[in-house]
A protein has these predicted regions:
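An acidic-aromatic
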Residues: 73-139
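Short, charge-rich amphipathic segments
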Residues: 6, 38-39, 43, 121-126
Length: 227
């Protein structure tokens, strides 16, 4: 019995010593977002496009403001196209352009009249491709990616959710945000709609870089919408 007691005491001492040596390393480790909300829905660019919604945005970038009506056409032979109608305003004629939809929503083969507007859409509505070509969780505090602004690193994450009001109506939505200087940059997502429904993005000096909002939505087949 004395030998067993000595062995037990020695084992406790060894465990304590190992824990003491390991603690400085464990305590300095940075753990990421490892508890995935497995019950939450997920979203990616293009999710819900098969329901062929028609989404009309007001888009502003710098001094350019216009309306963009985007109709997701039915899938044909495994491919899908997007019909975009640009209304430049100011009495200018509407510009129509049909483009094939790819994974990253990068439309380079467009007509000369529509190119300036597609360049704006590329920097605004379609820019969500940088963070969500793969499925991301729609849950509070879920992280969607890292942003590097100058010497600072920020995380894009879900900061709010619930029923929210927009120009097109109300819907259960998810707010993603990150800070640049004194400004919070915000992007709103509605599950089963293939593009973000709203965004307000600022530059490091606090100036509005671009904004857009879904003003009209025709999506009778899209599940889960609340109007």
């Amino acid at each position: 019995m004395p030998n067993i007691r000595i062995i037990a005491i020695f084992a406790v001492i060894v465990i304590a010593a190992v824990a003491g040596l390991a603690w400085p390393f464990i305590s300095t480790m940075k753990f990421g977002y490892i508890m995935e909300p497995v019950q939450a829905s997920q979203w990616h660019m293009g999710k819900g496009s098969e329901y062929t919604p028609e989404m009309t945005y007001q888009v502003t970038l710098n001094q350019t403001t216009f309306l963009a009506d985007m109709k997701f056409l039915p899938v044909s032979q495994g491919a899908q196209q997007l019909l975009v109608k640009i209304n430049p305003g100011g009495g200018a004629s509407e510009i129509d352009q049909t483009v094939p939809i790819g994974l990253v929503y990068d439309f380079v083969d467009v007509s000369a009249p529509s190119k300036p507007y597609f360049d704006v859409l590329d920097q605004s509505v379609f820019s969500m491709r940088d963070y969500a070509t793969e499925a991301k969780y729609l849950a509070k505090d879920a992280e969607w990616g890292d942003l590097y602004i100058g010497a600072n690193a920020e995380k894009l994450k879900v900061t709010d959710s619930g029923k929210m009001s927009f120009k097109f109506g109300s819907a259960d939505a998810y707010l993603l945000s990150y800070r640049i200087g004194a400004k919070m940059n915000k992007i709103w997502i509605v599950d089963n709609l293939p593009l973000p429904v709203k965004a307000e993005i600022y530059d490091p000096d606090g100036n509005l870089q671009y904004s857009y909002e879904l003003g009209s939505l025709k999506a009778p087949s899209t599940p889960g919408l609340i109007s």
